[in-house]
Amino acid sequence: MTKNINNIIGWGISKEKLHSKLSDGTYKLQTLDIDFGTKCSLHCPHCFKSKFNQNESKGNALTFDETKKIILQAKELGLESIKILGAGDPLENEDFLDFVKFNSSLDIHTCVFTKGHILGNDELAKKYNQKYGITNARDLAKELYNLKTSILLGFNSFKEDTQLDFVGLPKFDYYNYRESALKLLIELGFNSFKENTATRLALICAPYKLSNIDEVFDIYKFGKEQNIYVAACPSTVSGMGHSEQEQIQKQKGEFYNKSIDLYTKIYVWAINNGYVTKEDFEKDGVSLYPGAHICNQVAAGLYIIWDGKVMVCPGLDGADAIVYEDVRKKPLKEIWIDSPNYQRAGMIDKFNFQCVAREKELFNNDNFYSIVYKKVLEAIQ
């Protein structure tokens, strides 16, 4: 028996729910990745959003009302969860709490990707939430705790200098803000253990690079031992992740070999300590996120970016990743049914969809997952 549910509420789709249908036979749209706002005071060099995607000057950004209409359409298609990915840090959007409250009123769980600086600083929490009467970070975190939310906190390193490199602000007191945010979220119980229930707190060690790859196992262990989900993976192949991918190619041999060792070490430890069962690993294989839930959102949802484009997922941003040009111009049900992700929803015997973007671009189709799978099984025999 595992010690906890190896997932975070609102992200991984369970075997019982994946490939499920509506009463009319349509495969359910169970989850959405979505951009909500573009403001961000950080300058992460690996950001999966290109700089031009954070520029609203074109005037075609989705409004709050348009976003709510999309959610209402998705609810009719079976929507249960939303992940707010960007385009900026969602907690820098003054309408953020209204959006989360709207989702909660529809019984939709919201996963919030954030670097934590707003939740770690009273002045920043007040700055973006004055209209709600919130004056400090604790009140903001309490409000989120009382709503249907999970917090996915950016966490690339235990080391201050390394972490500051990942947010691009060497003179900013970000590291201490992040530490304060993590402490606060733990104090409020986002990671409290509940029988047969996933946690509501995650550490997102993404991307990992050669500069922090030697810390990833320790971050994973630190999180799991506190009932905190941990998701680590290489760079996306989107936005400024393209330049990261180019750098990885220059370091190909070292990065590839260290990644194999990292994934293997995490899985062996997770299996030996009851966080992943041997049976599940043998059946499901290696996840994009080592030791974490299988990545399968591409068979249950879509990604809607700030200007209305509908994408396959956040991992790619090329023309072949665009499902539809503007979600405002066509019913969401039609977009969903016509999408390649809907075809994946019909692959009823498949659970693990790994990550085509990273496997192809970063690992050059070198059977990365199968190599890790074999090494893990050899180590745990």
Task: Pin down the residues of each PLM region.
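N-terminal pre-core extensions flanking Radical SAM catalytic domains
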Residues: 1-56, 282-289, 299-301, 309-314, ...
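Intrinsic-disorder-associated interaction segments
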Residues: 2, 11, 130-133, 252-259, ...
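Conserved alpha-helical substructure of the radical SAM core
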Residues: 2-142, 147-149
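Radical SAM enzyme [4Fe-4S]-AdoMet core and its adjacent flexible, acidic
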Residues: 8-11, 76, 109, 145-298, ...
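Generic domain-boundary/flexible-linker signal
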Residues: 55-58, 93, 121-123, 162-164, ...
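A structural signal for short hydrophobic/aromatic patches embedded in well-ordered alpha helices
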Residues: 70-71, 99, 166, 219, ...
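Short, solvent-exposed turn/loop segments enriched in Gly/Ser/Thr/Pro and often Arg
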Residues: 88, 236, 354
